[in-house]
């Protein structure tokens, strides 16, 4: 068994903001949704061999505790944190996970995102 994808929700009409945040800021690549699923809206993206799906939820409630944890190479972590902060996203560093440097941020819809790298 492998993890195929993670889904987060966004409010109706969030696709443009999702593309900017996950694509332009985080560097994920958008993939085409199957034709039969396009009418429901949302955006699908890839992270290496896994996928991140942003689905539409109405009424929408952001995931403030449950979250995906993204891993980057150590040299990328500070650069990514700076890019997010410069774009107005909150970056909250957390040193409680031994052997990992990480921070939390939120997408434009309030969904919590963890981004980390091996320490040292």
Language model features with spans:
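Short glycine-enriched loop/turn motifs at secondary-structure junctions
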Residues: 1-2, 61-65, 96-97
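Short secondary-structure junctions
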Residues: 27-34, 88-94
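Short beta-strand micro-motifs in enzyme catalytic cores
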Residues: 41-43, 66, 99-103
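Vicinal oxygen chelate
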Residues: 87-120
């Amino acid at each position: 068994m492998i993890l195929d994808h993670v889904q987060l929700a966004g409010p109706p009409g969030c696709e443009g903001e999702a593309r900017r945040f996950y694509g332009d800021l985080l560097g994920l690549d958008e993939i085409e949704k199957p034709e039969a699923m396009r009418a429901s809206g949302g955006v699908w993206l890839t992270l290496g061999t896994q996928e991140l799906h942003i689905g539409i939820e109405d009424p929408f409630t952001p995931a403030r505790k449950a979250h995906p944890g993204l891993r980057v190479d150590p040299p990328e972590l500070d650069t990514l944190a700076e890019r997010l902060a410069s774009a107005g996203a909150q970056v909250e560093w957390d040193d409680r996970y031994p052997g990992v440097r990480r921070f939390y941020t939120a997408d434009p819809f309030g969904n919590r995102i963890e981004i980390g790298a091996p320490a040292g």
